[in-house]
Amino acid sequence: MSEMTPREIVHELDRHIIGQAEAKRAVAIALRNRWRRMQLSNELRQEVAPKNILMIGPTGVGKTEIARRLAKLANAPFIKVEATKFTEVGYVGKEVDTIIRDLTDMALKMMREQEMEKVRFRAHEAAEERVLDVLLPPARSNWGEAEKSETGTHTRQIFRKKLREGELDDKEIEIDVAAPQMGVEIMAPPGMEEMTNQLQGLFQNMSAGNTHKRKLKVKDALKQLVEEEAGRLLNPEELKEKTIHAVENNGIVFIDEFDKICKRGESSGPDVSREGVQRDLLPLIEGCTVNTKHGMVRTDHILFIASGAFQIAKPSDLIPELQGRLPIRVELKNLTVDDFERILTEPNASLTEQYQALMATEQVKIEFTAEGIRSIAEAAWQVNERTENIGARRLHTVLEKLMEDISYDAADNAGQLFSIDAEYVNRYLGALIEDEDLSRFIL
């Protein structure tokens, strides 16, 4: 997992997300605490529980983006889910246990890639030998056994050199490759996921070990054979053990739309997608054992980060037991005009950079002046204030409308320079911003 300090994590998040320093600090400390815990003695390590986080803030202020960037920084098993996808046990819909099953599947894929990287050199050598066997079939004796000769060995070395230098890349060869596993989707009733996994595993095992001939270019054949040979060098049981250890000690679950599972008002009927889901999440967040197809996974030390807008419901509307399982509360602020201005220019691959790069593919140069960027930021902020506040996502809508004509005629304007200044922004967006009804539908 990542060994970055909280300051380094915040600095990395600052490259992509503007503002929200409090949320970044909380997430950075939580991530660093995962590393700190792993440095403790085994006895003490079992006692240190993660401090789960509840992020509160309106839509479009960076909650999901923080999670997305955190996933890349963490170098640990990470999954993002929407709370609205789940229902109470016994009803149609996903059960909360599938969160851990999906997290384990993703962790296995990540661990497999890491382990394959370690054996890639040996796998590449084995794949080279298989390609050379096809290009230069070894001479056979009368008894059908392969014979070695100095001439054959010398020729093989010449071909090996050509293969490594790419001279044989476009030559077509026929090789035996592993047959693709049988993909079987089984729709199972709630609570029967384990049986479904076993049946899927049974069908996949039926096709395991089968091979079929394929005609491929040497370059593509080598790539496929390297993956195949690397897979053979891995120990499946050891891989599963490492995966479960990584999930239990470093796993991070980000649950979005958490406010949507709050119970609103008094209702006498069953609330299967709200309070029932909260009660199902309780043991998961507190610590329980989930049965997955890779083995039993304990959730005691998995970090849970919940986030929601909480515009209608309040955090206090969550059941008290769940509130206690999310001790760290972080409030994300509404974005200002200055924030919008910074979002347009400061992050890596900012929106203005993206449009400039897209238009450059058709030899059209776009220049955003400081006044133009300020006008775009003000336009987005005004529309948010007058209609629905969707945060930074409004910038996408405003910019797309602003660039519509340039994008449409780009092929006819190769070599031209367009300057997006305050006057240009006012010409294209002024009337829309002033007319509230129009801005509701178009912006």
Swiss-Prot record:
SUPFAM superfamilies: P-loop containing nucleoside triphosphate hydrolases
GO BP: protein unfolding; proteolysis involved in protein catabolic process
Xref: InterPro entries: AAA+_ATPase (IPR003593), ATP-dep_Clp_protease_ClpX (IPR050052), ATPase_AAA_core (IPR003959), Clp_ATPase_C (IPR019489), HslU (IPR004491), P-loop_NTPase (IPR027417)
CDD domains: RecA-like_HslU
Keywords per UniProt: ATP-binding, Chaperone, Cytoplasm, Nucleotide-binding, Stress response
Record's GO cellular component terms: HslUV protease complex
Localization of this protein: Cytoplasm
Residues where ATP binds: I18, G60, V61, G62, K63, T64, E65, D256, E321, R393
Disulfide bond residue pairs: none
Main location: cytoplasm
Transmembrane keyword on record: no
Entry annotated with the keyword ATP-binding: yes
Recorded GO MF terms: ATP binding; ATP hydrolysis activity; peptidase activity; proteasome-activating activity
Family, similarity comment: Belongs to the ClpX chaperone family. HslU subfamily.
Quaternary structure (record): A double ring-shaped homohexamer of HslV is capped on each side by a ring-shaped HslU homohexamer. The assembly of the HslU/HslV complex is dependent on binding of ATP.
Record function comment: ATPase subunit of a proteasome-like degradation complex; this subunit has chaperone activity. The binding of ATP and its subsequent hydrolysis by HslU are essential for unfolding of protein substrates subsequently hydrolyzed by HslV. HslU recognizes the N-terminal part of its protein substrates and unfolds these before they are guided to HslV for hydrolysis.
Protein name in UniProt: ATP-dependent protease ATPase subunit HslU
